[in-house]
Amino acid sequence: MSCTASYAGMTTPVKDKEGHGIPCLQPIDVVECTYQYFTKSRNKLSLRVGDLIYVLTKGSNGWWDGVLIRHSANNNNNNSLILDRGWFPPSFTRSILNELHGVPDIGNELEIFQAGLNLKLELSSNPVILSLEDFLDCCRDIEFKEQLAWSPTPVHERKGCCELLYYNQDLDVYCRTLPYLPQNQVETVNDYSSFPAISKIAGKKMPITSSPDLFYLNDCDVVYWYDLTRLVCHYVNLTERDLLANEREKFLTSLDLLTAQITYVYMLFRNLRLVEDSFKKTLKKLIYTLSRFSINANIWFHSTSFEEREAIASQKDPERRSPLLQSILGTFQKFHFLLRLLHFLSNPNELTILPQLTPRFFKDSFNTISWNNPFLRTVFNQHMSMTLPRQMIKAVAGASGIVAENIDEIPASKQGTFISSETSHHSPSAPFQRRRRGTIFSNVSGSSDESDTIWSKRKKPYPLNEETLSLVRARKKQLDGKLKQMIKSANEYLSNTANFSKMLNFEMNFKTYEEVSGTIPIIDILENLDLTIFLNLRELGDENRVFDEDVAIGDEDKEFLKHSLSSLSYILSDYFNMKQYFHDVVVKFIIVAQHLTLEDPFVFSPMQNDLPTGYYEPMKPSSLNLDNAKDKKNGSQNTDIQEEEDEYEPDPDSLILFHNLINQDSDFNDLKFFNLAHVFKKSCDDYFDVLKLAIEFVNQLILERENLLNYAARMMKNNITELLLRGEEGYGSYDGGETAEKSDTNAVYADSDTKDNDEWRDSQVKLPRYLQREYDSELIWGPIVRIKGGSKHALISYLTDNEKKDLFFNITFLITFRSIFTTTEFLSYLISQYNLDPPEDLCFEEYNEWVTKKLIPVKCRVVEIMTTFFKQYWFPGYDEPDLATLNLDYFAQVAIKENITGSVELLKEVNQKFKLGNIQEATAPMKTLDQQICQDHYSGTLYSTTESILAVDPVLFATQLTILEHEIYCEITIFDCLQKIWKNKYTKSYGASPGLNEFISFANKLTNFISYSVVKEADKSKRAKLLSHFIFIAEYCRKFNNFSSMTAIISALYSSPIYRLEKTWQAVIPQTRDLLQSLNKLMDPKKNFINYRNELKSLHSAPCVPFFGVYLSDLTFTDSGNPDYLVLEHGLKGVHDEKKYINFNKRSRLVDILQEIIYFKKTHYDFTKDRTVIECISNSLENIPHIEKQYQLSLIIEPKPRKKVVPNSNSNNKSQEKSRDDQTDEGKTSTKKDRFPKFQLHKTKKKAPKVSK
């Protein structure tokens, strides 16, 4: 049954484009047809595979009431979309309501129908008029479901006569005589297709449908029935027009394209299992009619001259045309009608997704380039092949008749034999050990288990740093000399072709291959650059990111990351385009060099396809009109590269050959005749330029990486730094200066002698066996007499050693013990060490000596360590419920009874920590009196105006700012730092880091205050004064060694709202801008803030407020980038010890950094405190608008900047400073196109020479 939108079941109103309310269908479910179901009943729906049915009612009898949205074949009907509603069996369908990602938007399709969208199918440019014989011939043996209705229509002819034609609205055809088709007999047998439990094709193979998430689709791909029908009709009309226009070449092209579309239609009906006799017969007649039309049209074009055809075709009266042309047009009329008939019989659901007609790559299964692209990698299911996506396997399995639920049971060997790029990076397979022939440009895709690409053979990627850039530059420098010599040889050939022998051509060819071989290291670097930081940046912008849930990213940080990703996307896109361009240039270089050895450089030209790429590809809907058809046939839609003009004289030999071909009337196929030496020189120039381009992009990526880390470090966002660098090669390396171990690794060879304390070792050998340490063999020593690692027992034994007291080891252990033990476990080890058991087989004298020289000293050391731990290193977060089981007070009382030194003090500390309570109050840092005064006696005085800020002397402002920030810095504890980097890694008892968080918050508030003070000022001259004023304050902060405030001010002046103020920066004198440049250079993040670190080392006993972002980065890198345990290898490679050895060297490095932090808290400033200024500073930093609001104010005071006046000429802060007024997309597109031209060997040469008669 059919009904229009106004009579369908309506529940929810929607509005059309004009705002009028329209009733809308509200389906309760959406199902997709999985098996065909045909019926002749008028109250039931016939279903085809892929049809979408909107369910309105689910009947209790097993039948469902549903709706299909279809297109009407009637071109005169305004409502070309109609509803087919009826009952259907649900067993032939499956619900897809929860799989909206793979089907069209339901609401959108229904709204399109309800709004009455008129999608007209231009099935013909002229009405189709058939004779009775032709109509009956076309419709013979065709079974119509209903009797065709004909309407008499009078038609006025030019002679004044009136002819009566009969018109059928469904088929959109006129017939000169009223046709009569006998009605089909009603079958009395049961309709087996009406039973839902039976399907004609159940269990057979199914076609792969072109779901949007399966293939890399072209925008012009045919997805729905309507698109295909419209495409076929377009070529039908185009072919007829070219025939009547007497354009032979265009007609043959149009006919070729029409034949291809009819082939697609045939493939489509076959894949959709439309096996009814009516479809088969109509398709056969359609193809037969097209063949007759093609033969007769070719006879027409070859039997008469152009002038005769022009005269006949120009006749407006059809009766005066030749019989052959009338026969051709009559045949084409039948073709038009058969196409209408096919469309009428199929009556398809316009929402049905068609099988993929043109070849396309599966998503995530092919990189589409010869290079490694880490942004295309996908994490797959562990049961699946590492390179075959699940959607692809499901589709192929479904097409092979495998049930989708059994996909996971398919063996991995049958799912694919590809090697993951990530796996091959770190685990090269055995076949890589063998030599094999291949090319560096071989593609990643393939069925082989071995990959020919260089990137798959390298274990570690190249880091984005200056060292990698130096490698590229050094290799390019080696190639430049050879390349210049080759260019010189080409120039000599151009100047004197007579003396240039064939041997020299071979020599140039040999040098080309030698040059390309020298390029392999550059290709290796480009292929294996470590882009982890940019991958992490993309993941940070993803809502479903896989990072730790406890890492919080603020709104301001999200805005920055989003802006950085947007800015970097163009750079990364250009980088990959450059890689592909590099590939094209090298390939072209090799081909041109091979041409030098050929006598006829055009010997391979016949191998080239005459048709342009994408010739048979479908067209865009906007191009489906007869006016734009010419562009398609000429191939202009597929060629977007303009031919370049070469600046050289035509080769005389080429001119002679060209003239001879013209005189002999030979087909030269528009080949461009060019000078090979000039082409070779041009290829050398392109090769030279692309090498420079590679260096430029590597340098750009290095700068962008440093910019990201610079922002995170300056704003002390160590969580962002950790997330950005996670997984990067070498992440976590810490340069601790003289105390750090050089060339340190996490792999230790147990058979090598790493102990560097010979005297102590000799003294241990001389001791009796019962006095020697039991676990000494399980200690690993570093080269500077430091413990590098060891087992838990060995570390505890060394901590309580009775002969040697390693003060640094003890401090490091007590600070970082929580990363090795739980508190209960640590104290249990100490109690066990206190209660040492004597060695076996000791005599009475040996036992007394063991008690005197080892047991009692060890007990004293245990009590001393415990007392020191509770007194100096105890943190409330260390408290655990299981500690009560240790009975520490009883242990201390036992030690008192045994007269162990320090046991009384130990009992006092235990009682204070666990019995008296007030743990938090006893250990919490106390705020200074001045800070309490500032909070208790709040003053409303603020630096809220430009005048009030400028009125404060820069020296006074810097002095008071230094006093205030140093007081906050002194409140930072080592536990604040450990909490910041460990978070909940070892225990969930850690809370916030109050001291450190307050220090970071103060610095960030100061940055926002500086930037907001500038952008809120409307007067340009006052803004310039404010900039100068803050620069002077930053300079005085540097003189006072207040690097924290200095960095906060610099970060504000280089932020986006301030940095883009072109006119304001112009008003600042150059000397002041140079001063800012010198300050910024001091905080340059290159080489891990090497300038700042050297400045910090030069300070000895002077007071200082260090920039804490560097410490946070060092702590984060050291903790996250080094493993907790060492890998112990024996002399034989590959033999690993199963014991876990604690990486104590990692803890030592952390303590080195903590000691430097504590060092600057010891020396205080001798400045006079001005409470008024301090109160004003503290109060002014509150309630500052967000950075986004500041940027809007910046756009108001200086809209549309054209050119930036940069206070610093370098680009250290490019990502942070970059204005959001990016270039237009058109500008970027044109630049990219000019920079990376497509590789075309013979189409980028000079035009064919002009021939003069």
UniProtKB/Swiss-Prot annotation:
Pfam families: RasGEF, RasGEF_N. Keywords: Cell cycle, Cell division, Guanine-nucleotide releasing factor, SH3 domain. Residues 1215-1237 have a biased composition (Basic and acidic residues). SMART domains: RasGEF, RasGEFN, SH3. One of its GO terms (cellular component) is plasma membrane. PROSITE patterns: RASGEF (PS00720), RASGEF_CAT (PS50009), RASGEF_NTER (PS50212), SH3 (PS50002). PANTHER family: CELL DIVISION CONTROL PROTEIN 25 (PTHR23113:SF368), GUANINE NUCLEOTIDE EXCHANGE FACTOR (PTHR23113). This is Guanine nucleotide exchange factor SDC25. The lineage of its organism: Eukaryota, Fungi, Dikarya, Ascomycota, Saccharomycotina.
